[in-house]
UniProtKB/Swiss-Prot annotation:
Species assigned in the record: Clostridioides difficile (strain CD196) (Peptoclostridium difficile)
Function statement: Component of the HPA decarboxylase that decarboxylates phenylacetates with a hydroxyl group in the p-position. Active toward 4-hydroxyphenylacetate and 3,4-dihydroxyphenylacetate, forming 4-methylphenol and 4-methylcatechol, respectively. Is likely involved in the catabolism of aromatic amino acids such as tyrosine fermentation. 4-methylphenol (p-cresol) formation provides metabolic toxicity, which allows an active suppression of other microbes and may provide growth advantages for the producers in highly competitive environments.
UniProt KW keywords: 4Fe-4S, Iron, Iron-sulfur, Lyase, Metal-binding
Catalytic activity, as annotated: 4-hydroxyphenylacetate + H(+) = 4-methylphenol + CO2; 3,4-dihydroxyphenylacetate + H(+) = 4-methylcatechol + CO2
Gene: hpdC
Cofactor: [4Fe-4S] cluster
Protein's UniProt name: 4-hydroxyphenylacetate decarboxylase small subunit
Entry note: cofactor: Binds 2 [4Fe-4S] clusters per subunit.
Binding site for [4Fe-4S] cluster 2: 43, 46, 60, 78
Complexes and interactors: Heterooctamer consisting of 4 large (HpdB) subunits and 4 small (HpdC) subunits, arranged as a tetramer of heterodimers.
Length: 85
């Protein structure tokens, strides 16, 4: 399930809510995303994110040096991010 926080149109206001840039409405970040979602690059949707455990910690193998990362880490500026198929 994709959440509002997985969308490029979500603008965080605090730790639990934000504003949708499309509707201009206040929304909870953990609610289900709308059909207009523009998926935010995050480690969890990258083909280079592997071996994730139950807590969402995995390994990035897409950069020069492999390292442990959180699945929810924003990867908008990551040079190694490649969306999963």
């Amino acid at each position: 399930m994709r959440k509002h926080s997985d969308c490029m149109n979500f603008c965080a206001v605090d730790a639990t809510k934000g504003i949708c840039r499309l509707s201009k409405q206040m929304i909870n970040l953990d609610d289900s995303a709308c059909p207009e979602i523009k998926v935010m690059p995050k480690c969890k949707n990258c083909k280079n994110f592997v071996e994730a455990n139950d807590e969402g910690i995995g390994k990035c193998v897409g950069l020069e040096k492999e390292d442990w990362v959180y699945s929810t880490l924003n990867a908008i500026t990551c040079e190694g991010h490649v969306f999963n198929e």
